[in-house]
Amino acid sequence: MSGLFSSVGRKGLFLIDPEKAHGLSVAALKSGFLPTCMVPHDPRLQQTVAGLVFPNPLGMAAGYDKNAEVPGPLLRLGFGFTEIGTVTPRAQSGNPKPRIFRLVEDEGVINRLGFNNEGHAAALERLTQARLRGIVGVNIGANKDSEDRIADYVQGIEAFYAVASYFTVNISSPNTPGLRDLQARESLAALLTAVLERRKTEAERLGKRIPIFLKIAPDLTEEGLDDVAEEALAHDLDGLIVSNTTLSREGLRPGPHRGEAGGLSGKPLFELSTTVLAKMRRRVGANLPIIGVGGVSSAETALEKVRAGADLVQLYSCMVYEGPGLPSAIVKGMSKLVAREGVETIRDLRDSAVDRWADRKLG
């Protein structure tokens, strides 16, 4: 599928507006047009993280399936888990179009979508009806015009508690004004306290404890990373997701869209996001789970995230360039790489490159 996509499908899709092309890809998944890409079960890739058993460590990041339209078809592409959202309490249209830009020269994407989604009710109805057996996380956010953003996150926990495999508290999108301010220490402490208190209430009501992850930006300073790490460890948080898109444009090749406002993802994000991942692993120690995101485009880059401290990895933007066969190719490639290393489990490779990445300077 990836080869066919590279030679034929990509050229056709790239003639279409990126947002329309995304809609077509979702429609193709919904219709069953794309074939299932089965990956062989490899016990060396299976991971138990935050109490959940992941068949393999590769997940679809939030942002692709905003409204929970295709979690099942995504899992059938070979992903070990998927994440819907970001969803906000009320539907919102996001920022004006155009708002997605391909950086073909760099195999990157700039987006300034602004949490466009159909709201809690629509996504909840789809997840409830789907009754999926796989791991499906719910990425929750706040409405742009919300007067109480912390309350929006609390509402997300309450709304999806019965159907979410895990939650991601997304406070790191650069496209909602002021959202990243919630990463400041006092604001973060208040947010985590409120969200985790709601989790406690829902756990008592429904008799199950759903893991909660915090998704952070790659643009934090060393001091900002200190604050996030200390608050994460001070609260009953289940893990971190590192990282969201970046505002940096360092290293981009000349191109028509490199100056567009928004968050940069894809291959250009790999080094920065992996550096921040390793710095966070060094700060939080060995026990707090971390999901590594940003620039994963191959089995080698996925495994490098693990070496830099990730328990699991996610991708999205690189599939724009490689096609729907990418997840199965990565999982199969990771199996071969782990076998070559001669280890019993991929976990044995985690942290082996933390120092090399964490010693890099930011900015």
Swiss-Prot record:
Its EC number is 1.3.5.2. Binds 1 FMN per subunit. Keywords: Cell membrane, Flavoprotein, FMN, Membrane, Oxidoreductase, Pyrimidine biosynthesis. It is an enzyme of class 1 (oxidoreductase). Substrate binds at residues 66, 111-115, 170, 175, 244-245. The active site is at 173 (nucleophile). It is a peripheral membrane protein. Belongs to the dihydroorotate dehydrogenase family. Type 2 subfamily. This is Dihydroorotate dehydrogenase (quinone).
